[in-house]
Amino acid sequence: MSKIQIEQLSKRFVKRDKYIEALKDITLTIKQGEFVCLLGPSGCGKTTLLRILANLEKPSTGDVIINQTDKKKPLQSMVFQENGVIPWLTVEENVAFGLKMRHLSNDFVKERTEYYLQKVGLSKFRRLYPKELSGGMKQRVSIARAFANDPEILLMDEPFAALDEQNKFILQEELLAIWQETRKTVLFITHSIDEALLLSDRILLMSAQPGKIIKDVAIEMNRPRSIEKVRSDPEMTKIFLDIWEQLQSEVKQTRLK
Ligand SMILES: Nc1ncnc2c1ncn2[C@@H]1O[C@H](COP(=O)(O)OP(=O)(O)OP(=O)(O)O)[C@@H](O)[C@H]1O
């Protein structure tokens, strides 16, 4: 069943007296429960596409349809690279925030909050404020909140980009464990091919500006995956090199513009 349908989408921005063609003719279907990573050179329009899906930006032309199965659920939740937590709320209050806004029963909010705090290993830090947390802990709060909201789709914009390698691997595996349980439809932006290979059912590669989808690769490796398995698998190495070459050529084009 299709969860997200994008038809002939283009986006132009006006900057001073010039047009910037950020996205061009994007047509795409994402299935219910699919984990899709979006890769592409800097400035190719990845965040713009995510913002359109989050209804923070309107397409210039074309349509976006998110297939809503439950009207009581939010359509989407977003996780950003940084600053996604509310500084004056505790860890627990941050995770519960979306649920409280929907006026759900206190017992339900408490149970869901507790569940996701445990999933990301933050139960004993529940009373801390964001300024008392490390970068990795803050991202865990954002992930817990996004999943606790139980949205129709999850939009993640380089959520691990600011973390050190070790923390990144741990959070990637935690995210996969929660995703495998919930089977949310996820659209995840990354600059890392390794990250995309580890996480995705499918990788979409975008061209240099104006952003178009130039490659759509199914990643069929069995789950659960680990970075060690991904790096030692010959098929994954082949896909890595293929995407690497194409990405390099798109990055070079960006530099020539
Ligand atoms: N509100 C805006 N007004 C004008 N131009 C914009 C606006 N938002 C984005 N752009 C332009 O649209 C293009 C795509 O930007 P976007 O942030 O979507 O790219 P990106 O692929 O996410 O980049 P990065 O990988 O560096 O985060 C860029 O040229 C950017 O300058």
Features from the language model and the residues they span:
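Short helical segment in ABC ATPase nucleotide-binding domains corresponding to the A-loop/adjacent helical element
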Residues: 92-100, 110, 114, 218
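Helix-to-loop junction immediately C-terminal to a conserved catalytic motif
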Residues: 54
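The feature captures the beta-strand-to-loop junction immediately N-terminal to the Walker
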Residues: 39-41
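Conserved ABC transporter NBD signature motif
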Residues: 62-72
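Conserved signature/switch motifs of ABC ATPase nucleotide-binding domains
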Residues: 128-131, 149
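Catalytic Walker B motif of ABC-type/P-loop ATPase nucleotide-binding domains
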Residues: 154-157
